[in-house]
């Protein structure tokens, strides 16, 4: 899959869900379901409610995404 057609947007984690899923509220007010990317999982980076994150979304399904960065 080509990575040139992804949408990157910032948001805030609202709720943790089972299986490393998170409810993220985006800057534009929408809520999506997001999972953690492999690099974040590999480096044991903890994500808690209230954290500001960057989310990658596919233009084909705008209700799901992947957390790629947690701001310090």
Swiss-Prot record:
Compartments (UniProt record): Cytoplasm
Disulfide-bond pairs as recorded: none
Pfam families for the chain: eIF-1a
Span of domain S1-like: 1-72
Major subcellular site: cytoplasm
Known function: One of the essential components for the initiation of protein synthesis. Stabilizes the binding of IF-2 and IF-3 on the 30S subunit to which N-formylmethionyl-tRNA(fMet) subsequently binds. Helps modulate mRNA selection, yielding the 30S pre-initiation complex (PIC). Upon addition of the 50S ribosomal subunit IF-1, IF-2 and IF-3 are released leaving the mature 70S translation initiation complex.
Protein name: Translation initiation factor IF-1
Species of the source: Pediococcus pentosaceus (strain ATCC 25745 / CCUG 21536 / LMG 10740 / 183-1w)
Record lineage: Bacteria, Bacillati, Bacillota, Bacilli, Lactobacillales
């Amino acid at each position: 899959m080509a990575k040139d057609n992804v949408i990157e947007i910032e948001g805030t984690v609202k709720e943790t869900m089972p299986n490393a899923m998170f409810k993220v509220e985006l800057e534009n007010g929408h809520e999506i379901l997001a999972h953690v990317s492999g690099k974040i999982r590999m480096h044991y980076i903890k994500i808690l409610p209230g954290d500001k994150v960057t989310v990658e979304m596919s233009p084909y399904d705008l209700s799901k995404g992947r957390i790629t960065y947690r701001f310090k």
